[in-house]
Amino acid sequence: MSADRPGAGAVEPARPAAPRAGNMLDYARRELETFSRRGLCAVDSLILSWMAYLRIPADADEVVAGIRGWDGVRLADLHRAEYFGDYFAGMWSEEDGLRLLAAAAASPRLRDVRVVGHVESTDVRAEKQFAAVTFRLTDDLSYVAFRGTDSTLVGWKEDFNLSFRCPVPSQVAAARYLADVAGRLDGEFVVGGHSKGGNLAVYAAASVPADVGERITRVFSHDGPGFLPEFLSTGEFANVAPRIDKTLPQSSLVGMLLEQQEGFRVVKSNRL
């Protein structure tokens, strides 16, 4: 294998250079190499974090319903099924989500990625809004994505609960989900999420058993809220901290909540 072609489990350096001018849609449309040819970067992570907002209708056909299992469904086939009224319902920008899905479905880099292990759960009484999904990038590398806060009241309540409670129900669910995925899939993992999903990614990576944690190569938190000091002082957090890549848009509100000992980069962001 040539030196400039990373192996199947490769991830680009923790502080990659900014991509060429443009946005996520431009990137998805422009990048042609598969993950076997070029490792995952922060922009790939952000795209996959957005895909965690996907909702699957209860009456979905057999192909799309396969997303809930471990054989999964290709991103391109999700788009082809055309459940456009359901996919990003409740997201703060359904139109942007659909545009990004269309770009991913047409992208040689993303269209054959298999989407597996989709789960979502809302419990009003427990003030829990949780969803997660896993993307099989190569035979040796999977991206575990946690959904951020949606437009529901319970979702926002759980966000505010982060300011005085740890763990909240979704953090517990995230750690269990990541451990379950690791028991089902071989290879290494990158874990990430947008908004609250970024917080869940960090918590899960720090909380799984050591043999699972050793398989996690990177943790991405895109505008994710921070943590209470009690969590940041634990050995579990210290172990995962060097692998955390946290980015905040200049206009960040959610990502500046609580302690910021994870370290972060500020990026310009005003469009998809």
How would you describe each model-predicted region?
Residues 2-43, 48-61, 66-142, 146-188, ...:
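Alpha/beta hydrolase fold serine-hydrolase catalytic domain that processes acyl esters and thioesters
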